[in-house]
Every structure is written in structure tokens, then in C-alpha cells.
């Protein structure tokens, strides 16, 4: 493959995002809806998905996956709300949210890496358990519809574009540095691309799997916090689809699900926003259920054509 062709292929996800944004703005304007309101919705949803997906890159690079990330985000946000309502301590709320995200991911990694339980089994089980616990807490404390919440003034000063973009940029910059400029990142790609050769070279898969899941857990914690910044309440449906959406977003961003050397951090951000924009376009044109199904079909086509 020539250098120019590689550059063109690498640029496709960015071009697709620009085209999708243009189409989205055109559809919203043609229907007479408020463009600023819809842009805000896309922006906030895209920020959360991109942050969680960026951490998840460290899992997918190994050729593994975790579909419980959405449930973990819900669980972390739920514990954060409970913590603040009990203590009125903002800093403690953030610490609890981050720790909850990290612990949830580490449990998955330990079960999969140390006890050799298939990743699919562990993540599906964790998704069910975390969703059930969070739903029970939410319905008990506030009801399934109303949910539980913190006072809006607690996070109101953070609910602005500058803060959200700043958090995303800092998190992505940290992940890019770790992924592309440290021995850990290079070895992760090696393990994902050729696990047998990596093992023969003395690289322990379990070590990198645990560290990868840990970083994904940090992303879950940050994503849960940003969810509360956007809407300081949690319901049983909060972050419900994030786990599956991450897989679609990564493909949209130009990264193969199989991981390895072709893994890219930017795929999470570009793909995350592309997925959110496409999903909102389809919601505007057809019913949401069909729209979600179409996004899955498109992602499959992109993956198989990789």
C-alpha cells in the first residue's frame, strides 16, 4: 500500500465526521428545529462517549473487549450521587466515582486474566450485576422515572463547553502519551497484534490486561462525572448503551476491533462523535429503534471492509 493511499485511508474518519455534521445541521435546519439545542445534545453525548471510549482503547488494543462499561458508568454515577447527598463533599464524590469505575474494570480484568474466565462471560455478568444494583438503588431512593440527583448548583459552574473540552483534551493527551510514547503502549500493541510472539518474548499478557482495564476504569470514572455535570441526575437508563456504542465508535474512528499495531487513540474521539451525530440524524429521520439498528449495520460494513 502506497504512502498516499495510507494517508487517504487515515483521513476518511475525519472526512466522514465533517460530512455527518454538515448533513446533521442541514436536517435540523430544514425541519425548523433549534440548531443550538441539538448541537448541545450531540456535544454532551459525544464528550461522554469519547472519554469512556478513549480509555477502552487500551482494552480493545489487546484484542479484548468490555461491554459492561455502560453499566459501570451508571454504577459509578449512582455511587457519586449517593456520596454527595450523604456528605455534601464534592471532592469525595469525585474520588468515589473514579474509584468505582476503576474497581469495576479491575474486577473484569482479574476474572478474565487471573481466573481465565472468558471475557464475554465476565463482562456480560458484570453488566447485569452492575445494572441491577444501580437500578435497585435508584428505584429505592428516587423512583425509576425521576431517579436520584444532586443539587444542580453543585456542578452548574462546570457545565460549560470550555471545561468539558478541557477535560477531554487532557484525558486524550494523557492517553496518547501513554499509548504512543511509553513502553507500556508499545507492548500493548505488540500483545494485541501477535500474542504468541509477545509471550515468547517474555511479555506477560495478564500484566498489560490488568493495566489496560485500569485505564479504562479511569475513563469510566471521568465519563460518569461528566454525565453528572451535564445532567445532575441519574436514572435507570443513564449511560445504558455506552458499552455497545464504544465498539461501533471505534470502528467508525478507523480502528480494527482486533486491536494490535493499527490501534489509535484518536479513533475513540472521532468515532465517538461520528456515532452520536449519525444516531441523531437517524433519530430525526426515522424512529430511534430502527436508527440504532442501522448504525450497527453500518459499523459491520466498515469493520468487514477493513
Q: Which sequence ranges carry the predicted segments?
A:
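Structural signal for alpha-helical transmembrane segments and their membrane-water exit/capping regions
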Residues: 19-34, 62, 134-139, 176-183
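Alpha-helical transmembrane segments within multi-pass membrane transporters and channels
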Residues: 87-128, 270-271
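Conserved small/polar residues in nucleotide/adenosyl-binding loops
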Residues: 303-306
Amino acid at each position: 500500500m502506497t504512502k498516499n493511499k495510507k494517508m487517504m485511508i487515515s483521513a476518511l474518519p475525519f472526512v466522514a465526521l465533517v460530512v455527518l455534521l454538515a448533513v446533521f445541521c442541514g436536517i435540523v435546519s430544514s425541519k425548523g428545529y433549534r440548531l443550538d439545542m441539538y448541537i448541545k445534545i450531540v456535544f454532551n453525548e459525544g464528550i461522554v462517549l469519547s472519554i469512556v471510549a478513549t480509555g477502552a482503547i487500551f482494552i480493545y488494543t489487546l484484542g479484548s473487549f468490555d461491554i459492561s462499561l455502560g453499566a459501570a458508568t451508571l454504577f459509578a454515577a449512582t455511587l457519586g450521587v449517593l456520596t454527595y447527598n450523604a456528605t455534601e463533599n464534592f471532592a469525595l464524590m469525585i474520588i468515589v466515582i473514579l474509584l468505582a469505575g476503576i474497581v469495576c474494570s479491575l474486577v473484569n480484568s482479574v476474572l478474565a486474566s487471573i481466573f481465565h474466565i472468558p471475557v464475554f462471560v465476565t463482562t456480560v455478568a458484570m453488566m447485569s450485576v452492575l445494572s441491577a444494583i444501580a437500578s435497585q438503588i435508584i428505584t429505592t431512593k428516587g423512583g425509576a422515572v425521576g431517579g436520584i440527583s444532586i443539587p444542580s448548583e453543585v456542578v452548574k459552574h462546570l457545565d460549560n463547553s470550555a471545561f468539558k473540552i478541557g477535560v477531554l483534551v487532557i484525558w486524550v493527551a494523557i492517553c496518547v502519551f501513554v499509548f504512543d510514547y511509553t513502553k507500556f503502549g508499545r507492548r500493548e500493541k505488540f500483545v494485541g497484534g501477535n500474542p504468541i510472539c509477545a509471550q515468547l518474548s517474555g511479555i506477560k499478557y495478564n500484566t498489560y490486561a490488568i493495566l489496560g482495564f485500569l485505564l479504562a476504569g479511569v475513563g469510566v470514572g471521568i465519563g460518569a462525572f461528566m454525565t453528572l455535570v451535564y445532567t445532575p441526575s441519574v436514572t435507570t437508563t443513564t449511560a445504558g448503551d455506552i458499552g455497545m456504542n464504544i465498539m461501533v465508535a471505534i470502528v467508525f474512528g478507523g480502528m480494527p476491533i482486533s486491536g494490535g499495531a493499527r490501534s489509535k487513540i484518536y479513533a475513540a474521539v472521532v468515532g465517538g462523535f461520528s456515532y452520536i451525530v449519525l444516531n441523531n440524524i437517524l433519530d430525526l429521520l426515522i424512529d430511534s429503534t430502527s436508527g440504532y439498528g442501522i448504525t450497527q449495520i453500518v459499523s459491520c460494513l466498515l469493520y468487514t471492509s477493513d
